Amino acid sequence: MTDEFTAPAYGDRSLGDVLPAVAAAMGVDAGLGPTSIELPEGRRYVVFLVDGLGYELLRDHPEEAPFLHSLLGAQAPATVGVPSTTATSLTSLGTALPPGTHGVVGYTSRIPGSDRLLNALLWDAGVDAREWQSHPTAFGRMAAAGVHTTVVNKRAFATSGLTVAGQRGAEFVGADRVGERLAAALEASTGSPSLTYLYDGDLDWTGHAYGVASMQWEQQLSMIDMAAEHLRETLPSDVRVVVVADHGMVDSPFDQRVDVDEVPDLQDGVALVGGEARFRHLYCRSGAVDDVVASWRSVLGTRAEVLSRDEALALGWFGEVSPVVRPRYGDVVVACRGDFAVQSLSAFPHEAKLLGLHGSLTSAEMLVPILVA
């Protein structure tokens, strides 16, 4: 693993190992495989995923999140996969598979055989989510093993491609407000055995908009902390609650960024730019991979790790990569260090408005808490 980067712990202590650990704690054989994550025995579990709640961010904010911070010591952090981004992480959680197997390889990635990108959050390219991610989900496997599985999320996500890719097989319950979410969790947990998944995206949104060093982010963290404590108080004591996250976040000042559109050497040989600002997929013109690697390394220097696809695969960044998934990855991938970012504002104009970013392999982005309440 390159300097300053955190290796993903696939099959050991990664986000994709959480549901296998839950199944083991329930005593349910869902065929999800072993994991080193150990959770307390229980027949009813609620998994609460807080988007953007990195381990280091929580560690550094004990006053803003006293309840969640008090739970930090019981479990070592887990890693997410690469890239450290929501679409990839949620699918790893939901399938118990690494990105190279489940195939949701980033925020945006090329649809093989085309010059188009799939936005995995919006699922906007007419791609069948069941074909793009064809493996059974962990939710579905647990349901088949007799566990009442429920996903509680905003109503708008009920039939989204990302929900279908990573969470099909569970009953979906729409809940747009915190109170609805709590009520849904309580109702879903009445059966035994049961697994209920809750999602909250407000902390991530706030971090993108204002940065993780902002008062707004700290206030939102406090609200999440109160919501988690209320969830624990509302549920019966024999219902286990596990709080996890899909990635951390770093603030990237706008003067610490490079725009591909403004540097001709970064455009030569590149047919399509995908990924996101902290982790880019570069899809190259025929025969241009070596030249693109050399040019990007020359321009970016130590600010980013620039690797060919084969080099990144050899490092194990994506876990086991299936032949059908392989061409979805960039011919070249670019992982940023420190607070650096690579924008492409012609293709991704919204990046000019995002102060907090994630996607790379720094510990601030890769490490997430496993909190048992």
What are these regions (language model features)?
Residues M1-A373:
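Feature captures the catalytic ectodomains and active-site-proximal regions of enzymes
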